[in-house]
């Protein structure tokens, strides 16, 4: 599947409804942080984390926490001030640590 063809729904179908809610929340944080960003190919930057999340969910089969961390990573990367605005307990320490660790290598 081409990165430009990937939808959030293609990712969500791999998870249970309660898991989907957290993925959607983290996706919307990333979408907001990336709304004005475009890639070198002039496509919306949100395509990149969608592509990574698709690989994580559909090809590797990692748990929903990893998918949420992919989107949270991009949200924090482009808007570091967002982390303190997220309600306490919304994301587990595991998800936050994965996202912050990804920021170290991005």
Which residue ranges define each predicted feature?
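Active-site helical microenvironments for divalent-metal-assisted chemistry
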Residues: 1-106
